Regions:
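A conserved position within tetratricopeptide repeats
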Residues: 58-74, 88, 104-106, 118, ...
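Short coil turns that delineate tetratricopeptide repeat
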Residues: 75, 108-109, 153, 196, ...
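Residue at a conserved register position within TPR or TPR-like alpha-solenoid repeats
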Residues: 88, 120-121, 166, 173, ...
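Structural signature of tandem alpha-helical TPR/SEL1-like repeats
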Residues: 91-99, 128, 133-144, 172-190, ...
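N-terminal leader/linker segments that initiate helical-solenoid repeat arrays
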Residues: 2-99, 107
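Extracytoplasmic/luminal low-complexity segments enriched in Pro/Gly and acidic/polar residues
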Residues: 199-267
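TPR alpha-solenoid repeat register
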Residues: 80, 113-114, 158, 201, ...
């Protein structure tokens, strides 16, 4: 499994700015329209549509390759399932691998297998140029990540993947509660509590701080990232952009020059 592809998938998806963070500010109590009820109804309709689409995919997925026989979908042979997943991984048939990984995870009630299934669903998102149902695949990833953490609550990697998945789901459909909106940040903070130097958690918390205009917190996060990984020019450019947003041109130029210097050195 290409873990760098998973990481890239999550990072690229996280860059997309969303209006979901302003949703609750716009949904005031005096509004004449019950936006929460409307969004809940819309989300339920989307969920039903997603389930139907996924069920249809499962019906046809067995014919997507001749290397793995279609009867594997009804097999309970864990050794055969594991081998099939490995073959599908090699062939970059990530959706099929995700389905079988989820099946294997349910048979074994194994948190690692549930996490593998989630990763395959995320990898499928950016594997091909063909249009994908991003919401469907992200929700399937979330479903498996929730199961991973139910069985292994201290899995920090799964917490980070879940935080980003929930963030992206909130980007695609309005969250139904304040708790759902805040959960990505809470999950990331749980990771930082036990691993204060976790690069991914610090990075995502920094980006969330920028989106919510908490620039001082964002600076704190990215300066720590610089101290942990001083050779990564991206962190310097992030700091440059934050200072620019704050109107501090001098600091912005300083961090930009540092980033440019690192880029030239690497080349």
């Amino acid at each position: 499994m290409n873990k760098s592809l998973i990481k890239a998938t999550l990072w690229v998806a996280f860059f997309v700015l969303t209006a979901s963070l302003t949703y609750f500010g716009l949904n005031r109590s005096e509004a004449s329209i019950d936006f929460k009820a409307l969004n809940k109804e819309k989300n339920q309709a989307q969920s039903a549509s997603i389930k139907e689409e996924f069920d249809n995919l499962i019906k046809n997925i067995g014919s997507s390759t001749t290397v793995v026989k279609p009867d594997i979908l009804s097999s309970t042979d864990t050794a055969r399932l594991s081998l099939s997943i490995q073959l599908l991984d090699t062939m970059k048939q990530y959706l099929y691998a995700a389905v079988l990984s989820e099946k294997l995870a349910n048979i074994q009630n194994n948190p690692t297998k549930f996490h593998d299934a989630a990763k395959y669903y995320l990898m499928e998102l950016y594997n091909h140029e063909a249009e994908k149902n991003e919401l469907m695949l992200t929700k399937k990833a979330r479903e498996n990540l929730e199961k991973t953490l139910a069985l292994k609550p201290k899995n920090n990697e799964a917490k980070i993947d879940l935080a980003v998945s929930i963030y992206n789901i909130n980007r695609m459909q309005a969250p139904e509660s304040q708790t759902e909106l805040m959960r990505p940040a809470l999950l990331l903070k749980e990771v930082i509590t036990v691993d204060s130097n976790n690069l991914d958690a610090l990075y995502y918390l920094g980006k969330l701080s920028i989106e919510t205009n908490q620039f001082e917190k964002a600076i704190e996060r990215f300066k720590k990232l610089v101290s942990l990984q001083p050779q990564n020019s991206d962190f310097y450019f992030e700091l440059s952009q934050i200072y620019a947003l704050m109107g501090n041109k001098e600091e912005s130029e300083l961090w930009n020059k540092k980033g440019q210097s690192l880029t030239k050195t690497i080349k």
